[in-house]
């Protein structure tokens, strides 16, 4: 007969895994965007003082951005936020903390659309990226070097 654990089992995630290079894939994206400008736009949304405490608006918006960049439905995005440490890190969600449900993400997007902020926010993101000649592909940065180079004239 097998004995039960005498000691507490190790968690499935250790400090080493939390610093794995795969969890830094969105760090460049994080660094190039001026999030204070995004927060300023988001701050115009009324936050109710009643009911359950809400998620930070920037956390929800970061989640919606991941949904756009990775072409995820709200249900898929919520599932990724539960299981993907990279997504949790980008959205500033704690490892053991709650994660927004698909309905929360959808209601938040609808609220942004109703307040004419969704297109404005995406436009601000695109403006910042364009100013730095950056194209995002599935959350990864591609820097476009558009330096003009004079070529020698060809011909005889």
State what each model feature region is.
Residues 23-65, 69-70:
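Basic, short loop/linker segments at the boundary and entry of helix-turn-helix/winged-helix-like folds
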């Amino acid at each position: 007969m097998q004995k039960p654990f005498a000691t507490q089992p190790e968690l499935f995630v250790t400090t080493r895994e939390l610093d794995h290079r795969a969890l830094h894939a969105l760090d460049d994206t994080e660094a190039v965007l001026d999030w204070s400008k995004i927060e300023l736009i988001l701050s115009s949304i009324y936050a109710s003082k009643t009911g359950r405490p809400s998620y930070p608006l920037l956390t929800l918006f970061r989640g919606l951005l991941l949904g756009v960049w990775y072409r995820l439905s709200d249900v898929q995005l919520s599932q990724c936020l539960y299981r993907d440490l990279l997504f949790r890190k980008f959205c500033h969600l704690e490892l053991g903390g709650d994660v927004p449900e698909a309905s929360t993400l959808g209601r938040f997007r609808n609220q942004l659309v109703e307040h004419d902020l969704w297109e404005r926010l995406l436009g601000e993101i695109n403006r910042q990226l364009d100013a730095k000649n950056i194209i995002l592909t599935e959350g990864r940065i591609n820097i476009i070097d558009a330096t003009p180079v004079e070529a020698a004239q060809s011909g005889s």
